[in-house]
Structure formats: C-alpha cells, structure tokens
Design a protein with these regions (language model features):
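His/Asp/Glu-rich metal-coordinating catalytic cores
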Residues: 1-60, 65, 69, 74-250, ...
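Conserved acidic residues
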Residues: 57, 196-197, 376, 403, ...
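A short acidic, amphipathic alpha-helical/loop segment
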Residues: 71-75, 254, 389-396, 473, ...
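Short, surface-exposed amphipathic charged segments that create phosphate/polyanion-binding patches used
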Residues: 134-142, 284-292, 470-474, 531-540
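Hard-cation-handling environments
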Residues: 223-419, 429-430, 483, 492
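A short, acidic, amphipathic alpha-helical segment used as a generic capping/interface helix at domain edges
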Residues: 389-397, 462-483
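Generic long, charged, amphipathic alpha-helical segments
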Residues: 432-474
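Conserved phosphate-binding/catalytic loops in two-lobed NTP-binding clefts
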Residues: 512-528
C-alpha cells in the first residue's frame, strides 16, 4: 500500500488522500475536499486529477464539510462511479451541503452533479467501532471525532485479520475536549483511535493552546448571556453569522439555555434563524441525537453528549430522562417536541423552563432591508459575511450603536467578517479616523468610519481541537502498544506554522514520556509514501 497527499499539504482546507496498491487492485481516496479561503487559491481543479476517476473503487469520507467533500460532484462528473462510504449522518448532511453549494454562482457544480453521487452509508446495526469489509482483506473502521455530527476518524486496515494486518488512521477533523471534560454544547466527546502502523493528523490549531477560560462551558454561556442581556437593555439586535453545520446548532442550543436560565429578564427576546441551509440541517442533527450505539456489553448515545444530561439535571440511564433530553433537543432545533407541547417535567429548573423560541420556517422571511423592532438575536448563514443573509444584515446593522455583531469562530483575514473582526479592539473614536471600507463582491461598500455597532468575538464555539487536544489524540490511544497512536505520524490540514509547532510539541511530549515517534510534515502533493515500512501492529 502507498499513500499520496493530494490536498491540505501546508494548508487548512482541501483534504484528499489517495491510497493505492496496484498488486492487489486497490485504488481509493480518503476525503475529496475543495480548497476554501486559502491565499494561494485552489490548485486541485477537477481537470488536474492525477488519476482517472473511473479507476477509483470508492471514497471514504470523514465528514460533511466542503473542505472534505466539496469535490465529490466533480469527481463523479469526471467519471467516478464507485460509492462514497461514510456514516449515515454524514451522507444526509453532505447531500444538503453540496446541494446548497450547487446553487451558488461560480461554484462550478450543479445539482445534477450532486445527484450522481452514490452514497453508501455504514450499516447502523453494526457496532460503530467494528471493522467493515470493503474488499477482500480491506477494511474500514470509524471512531467518533467530536467535530460535527457524523464526523469520524477513518482507519484503513489491509491484509488478513490478525497478526500481520497493517493499518493507517486518518484523524479527519478532531473536536475539542474529552470524556467528562466536554467543551461543545451538545456533541459527544471524541474517541481516541487504536494504535496503528501509521497515522495522519490534522493541525488546524496545532500551535494554539486555549486557556481554561476559553474552554469553560459555563464561561461561554456567561459571555453569551451578557451579549443577549445587553441588547435587551438597548432594544438592539445581536447578529451571529455562523456555519450552517455544527456551529448554528450549538448557538441555538446555548441561546435556548440562556433564556431558560433567565426567563423573566429575557422574556421579550426574539430569536431568528435566517439561514436556509441551517434550517434544513436542524432536523438531520435532531435525528442524529436520537441514535445509539449498541455494543456487546453496553448501549450509549452515539452523538448526544453526556454534558447535555449534566446541564439539564437528567439521568442518562433513565429512559424518561433520555426522552426529556431528546425532546429538548427537538424543541431547540425544530421547534417541535416529539410527544406534544407540554412543558418538560423532569430534570432541573433549566430543563423545566426550556421552551421552543425560534420562529417556524413557514413564517415569512425576515425583512433584511431594515433593523428588527425590539431585542432580537439573528443567527444567520454565510459565516464569512461575504454573501447571503450575513451580507445583507451587516450593511444594515453595523451602522447603529444599538446593535452588536459577533464572530463565532474562525474567519479568514481577507473575508468580510475577518475585516469586521479587526474592529473589535478599535475604539469608536478611532474608527472615525479610519480611511478604509468594508467591501462586498457585488460592489456594495461600507466606510469603516460609519460603523457604530459593537463588534466582538464570541469565543468557545470552535469545533476543532487545540494543541492539547491533539496531543491527547496522539498519546492517549485506546490500545496499549508503544503508547502512541502510531510510530509514524503525518501532520497535515494546517498552515506550516501550526504544523511545525505541533510537531515540536509532540516530540517534546515523546521525549518526556520515553516514547518513540517519527513526525513527518508532507511538503508536496506529487510524492508517494510507502506504507509497508513499519512493523505490523495487530489491530484488536
């Protein structure tokens, strides 16, 4: 078996890894993502495939973000006819995400391209961590990665099961936190993989160590409450541009929690979800939270986190409490409970005061031409602010001092929200001196001197692991062995500064603990790496 990294080499986006064993007839990809927001553009255009797409057997997909699945339509358009193997949740979400991308001008794909994709989700009646055969002596095994619902780390195993079988595990995008130290509002903790011969690790925040304050869910909620309470006082609007998959659902859950914790003070607050893709995603995520993993000796929620039960004072071993948690998730994401509209009668005061707050999708779309009347939170699509609802709202709300705009995660420096975020630390009187302007691709502009709204960064919502989390992924593998996830580790999916910092941290931890590990930073997309050089690690 040999491996070639076709994307995310020294960049954050464009994940695509090509695995091949000509002697055994194996030829497949792990992920097939597009480049996004990279300064050097997207070198991996469909015409540049280094293979004939018709010769590929399958694509193993880690999750449904465009930087991992965005080139699938082009791959099928250019001749690929095999299946995409992934979790059922990833298949559902990717259909929506790719369909939405096909509607964007200049995307280069059409709905017909998306409809060609042959999704082959993993069977739900098999335990999640069980190897799944895809060919003679070729298997895939998944581990929940804690990034978004459906997201997994993907292990490839080849050779007859037992001693001598070889394997490589691709991290996909790893989420923050761990068991009983969850950071995300709803999603269950990431799994550590079993030890392998080789591993590939993302490094989006490989050089970042978040403070305890940034990781503390209680402080995250307190920061959100302060913003919401502020606009209730001013009668203004809080604008939260957010990613449609993952980030929007987390924000909606926390907004409902904030109101449930302070119902009298916030009783007049209006919450608007102005994001067509996110509205379609909400139901998929609500259904995903119902899924359980039935193993030999236990049954556990697959995607619904333990932290939800702790926050709501519910017992995750009691069927009625489990149903109460699922009802709260359904109210939050879809506005409808599964068993009617009676208040929740179990759990703590927060659970019992929880109400569905978002307006139903059947209601007329909000008027983006003027600011809402009364205190309002708008969660909108287009997290970069460059188009869609965010672009319209920004041009209305940024001018008025009553309003607040907050970033909810990473924004590319050259994007609209990236430029807006730079104003967070610039006092209003200094903005008045600023000669620059915010520009949109349709020609609309807004002078920075005219921006009177408060601009802030709402921290705590990143769905990516930081350096400490990534070190845990490397050194806290589920299986014994040599104490590291693999003796050879490839670090990609990150800028070079992040990759170099992560490599240094890994080598330092290895030296301190007496572990041996080789950390490789792939540099070129045209080089093959042999996967036959390490002694086989028998996968258990």
């Amino acid at each position: 078996m040999k491996l070639r990294f076709l994307g995310a080499v020294g960049t954050v986006t464009g994940s695509c890894s090509w695995l091949q064993d000509p002697a055994r007839g194996w030829n497949f990809l792990v992920d097939c993502g597009m480049h996004q927001d990279e300064p050097d553009g997207a070198p991996g255009a469909p015409k540049d495939w280094p293979f004939d797409p018709a010769t590929l057997q399958f694509v193993a997909l880690t999750h449904a973000h465009l930087d991992h699945c965005g080139l699938l339509p082009a791959l099928y358009r250019d001749g690929f006819r095999g299946p995409v193997r992934c979790t059922p949740e990833t298949a559902e979400l990717a259909r929506l995400v790719l369909g939405d991308a096909a509607r964007l001008p200049g995307s280069g794909i059409t709905q017909a391209d998306v409809d060609r994709i042959l999704w082959k989700p993993f069977r739900e009646d098999q335990p999640f961590g069980q190897p799944r055969p895809v060919d003679q002596d070729l298997f895939l095994r998944t581990y929940r990665s804690g990034h978004i619902p459906g997201a997994v780390s993907m292990e490839v195993l080849w050779g007859a099961p037992g001693v001598g079988q070889r394997n490589i595990v691709f991290s996909g995008d790893v989420g923050p936190g761990g068991e009983d130290a969850e950071v995300a509002p709803m999603l269950r903790f990431p799994w550590n993989p079993r030890s392998a011969c080789f591993a590939v690790l993302e490094s989006t925040y490989g050089g970042t160590v978040r403070t305890p304050q940034e990781r503390d869910p209680a402080l995250r909620l307190a920061r959100l409450h302060a913003l919401v309470a502020g606009i209730v006082e001013t009668g203004g609007t809080l604008l939260l541009p957010a990613f449609a998959v993952g980030r929007t659902q987390d924000l909606m859950f926390d907004l409902h929690a904030v109101v449930a914790a302070d119902p009298l003070r916030l009783r007049d607050l209006r919450i608007v979800l102005d994001a067509p893709l996110a509205r379609r995603v909400q139901g998929v995520v609500a259904r995903a939270m119902q899924r359980v993993d039935v193993m030999r000796d236990k049954v556990r929620p697959l995607w619904l986190g333990k932290q939800v039960f702790r926050q709501l004072g519910l017992d995750d071993t009691e069927p009625d409490d489990i149903q109460a948690a699922l009802d709260i998730i359904a109210m939050t994401l879809t506005g409808v409970r599964g068993d009617g509209s009676q208040p929740i009668a179990r759990g703590n005061a927060l659970a019992q005061q929880w109400r569905a707050l978002t307006e139903p999708p059947t209601k007329a779309a909000p008027d983006r031409g003027r600011a809402p009347q009364g205190p309002t939170v708008i969660v909108c699509g287009s997290a970069d602010g460059c188009g869609g609802a965010a672009a319209s709202w920004l041009q209305i709300l940024l001018r008025d001092a009553r309003h607040v705009t907050a970033t909810t995660g990473y924004t590319a420096p050259h994007s609209v929200m990236g430029r807006v975020a730079t104003l967070a630390d610039l006092p209003l009187k200094e903005r008045r001196r600023h000669p620059g302007r915010i520009e949109w691709s349709d020609g609309r502009t807004l002078p920075i001197r005219d921006i009177g709204a408060t601009v802030t960064r709402l921290r705590g919502y990143s769905a990516h692991a930081d350096q400490a989390d990534l070190l845990d992924w490397v050194f806290l593998c589920r299986q014994g062995g040599d104490g590291v996830v693999a003796p050879t580790l490839f670090v990609q999916h990150g800028g070079d500064r992040e990759r170099v910092a992560l490599r240094a941290a890994i080598l330092q931890r290895a030296a301190e603990t007496g572990q041996r590990i080789s950390v490789v930073l792939p540099q070129r997309a045209d080089e093959w790496v042999s996967l036959e050089g390490q002694p086989a690690t028998p996968p258990a």
